[in-house]
Amino acid sequence: MENAFEKAYQKEQQAIAAFDAAKNDKEKEEARKLHYEAIAKIDNFGKSAIHIWREYQSSREHGNLNLNLSEVIWDEQVPEIVACMKANGIERFTFSATYTEAIKTAWLFQQEGYVLEGFVEINSRYTDAYGNSKKVPALQFRVK
C-alpha cells in the first residue's frame, strides 16, 4: 500500500520549490494551489491525521525516512492514530516520546497491531548550534 503521507509530503515539497522559483504572482498562486491540494488530502484522513502529518513533516525535514512520533499521545488516541496510519500506508514508524507514560503508549501500539522491532537512533527535530539534528534513541515498530 502506498504511504499517503509520503505522497502528500512530496507534493508539499513540489509546492515549496514552485513557490521559491515563482517569478510572478500567478506562479505563486499555482504553487499555493499545490500546497492546498496536499493539505486537503490530509484533512480527509480523519481527526488524527493532522497530528500524524505534523510529525511526518518534522521527521522527513530532519532526515528520517519514517514517521517519528515524538509528542504526547493519550491512551484513548492510540486506536485512532493506529487506524489512520494503517489505512494510509504507514508500515513502519519510530516512537521517541519521553513523557512519563510513553512506555504504556508503546505497549498500546503493539496491542493495536504494530510489532516492536527494537531500538534505533534517529534525528530529532532539535538542532545544535550548527543546525545539525540531534540524535536520539527511538523504538521502531512495523505493522503486523
Located regions from the model:
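Generic structural signal for short, flexible, solvent-exposed coil/loop and linker residues
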Residues: 82-84, 105, 130
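C-terminal edge-of-domain segments
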Residues: 116-144
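General "foldedness" signal
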Residues: 33, 107-109, 123
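An N-terminal amphipathic alpha-helical segment
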Residues: 1-101
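Short, aromatic/basic amphipathic alpha-helical patches
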Residues: 103-115
